[in-house]
């Protein structure tokens, strides 16, 4: 059995999408977000600075990061709180350069097939050889009308994704990493708007809206007209 819930913001084109996936041997009736995940993938390394990408992983879980960084660059670029969480919770860390793979095989920035194949290889939801076969069968069915070259590109993406990731040895020093993240705060000459942006807009934009108490919200049905500008804080 499988369950999928796809959470995305109002800026669908180029916006953030989160896929909550559950698998099991019995019917799945959960009606809530996953908060104890076995596997999390981050397809855009820029998200590490804005969202809590690893906080919902259970101890011993796996984190796949799509990035072009080697071990030295990971040490430099990973936020301190991410490094500490990974080390403290014995997270299995993997990296894959999906964009490089996509470019090499002719798919450009379309990396979903590459990352999906890496997921099945790491997560072991089903035997890897079965997952690869099913993915290739689906790609053939979906793209056969586009021509043999397109089908081959997608088959190559599946093969490269299943073998193109690297398991990172997590340094013991990461346990002592310091949270060096920058907290974004709105300022201005309108106290009511500043308060609303800091207490509501920023938490919602960083996907902490579900943690806000009811008392945070206005009791009247209006919103500030300048919110599109402030939503980019």
Spans of model-derived segments:
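Short glycine-rich anion-binding loops that position phosphate/pyrophosphate groups of nucleotides
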Residues: 45-47, 69-70, 99
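Anionic-ligand anchoring segments at beta-strand to alpha-helix junctions in alpha/beta enzyme folds, i.e.
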Residues: 1-40
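Short alpha-helices
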Residues: 77-142
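Ferredoxin-type iron-sulfur electron-transfer modules and their immediate structural context
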Residues: 131-132, 144-232
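ADP-ribose/adenylate-binding Rossmann-like module
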Residues: 56-82
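Glycine-rich phosphate-binding loop
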Residues: 27-59
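Redox-cofactor binding/interface segments in oxidoreductases and associated redox assembly factors
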Residues: 42, 65, 116
């Amino acid at each position: 059995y499988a369950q999928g819930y796809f959470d995305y913001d109002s800026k669908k084109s180029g916006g953030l999408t989160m896929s909550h996936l559950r698998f099991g041997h019995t019917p799945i009736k959960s009606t809530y977000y996953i908060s104890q995940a076995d596997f999390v993938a981050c397809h855009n390394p820029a998200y590490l600075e804005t969202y809590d990408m690893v906080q919902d992983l259970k101890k011993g879980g796996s984190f796949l990061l799509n990035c072009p960084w080697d071990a030295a660059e990971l040490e430099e670029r990973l936020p301190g709180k991410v490094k500490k969480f990974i080390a403290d919770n014995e997270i299995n860390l993997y990296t894959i350069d999906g964009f490089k793979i996509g470019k090499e095989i002719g798919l450009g920035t379309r990396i979903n097939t590459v990352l999906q194949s890496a997921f099945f290889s790491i997560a072991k939801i089903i035997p890897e050889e079965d997952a690869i076969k099913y993915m290739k069968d689906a790609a053939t069915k979906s793209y056969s009308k586009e021509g043999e070259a397109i089908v081959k590109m997608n088959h190559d993406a599946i093969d490269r994704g299943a073998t193109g990731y690297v398991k990172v040895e997590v340094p013991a020093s990461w346990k002592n990493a310091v949270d060096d993240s920058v907290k974004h705060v709105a300022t201005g000459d309108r106290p009511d708007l500043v308060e609303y942006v800091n207490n509501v807009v920023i938490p919602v934009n960083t996907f902490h809206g579900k943690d806000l108490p009811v008392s945070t919200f206005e009791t009247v049905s209006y919103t500030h007209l300048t919110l599109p500008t402030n939503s980019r804080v």
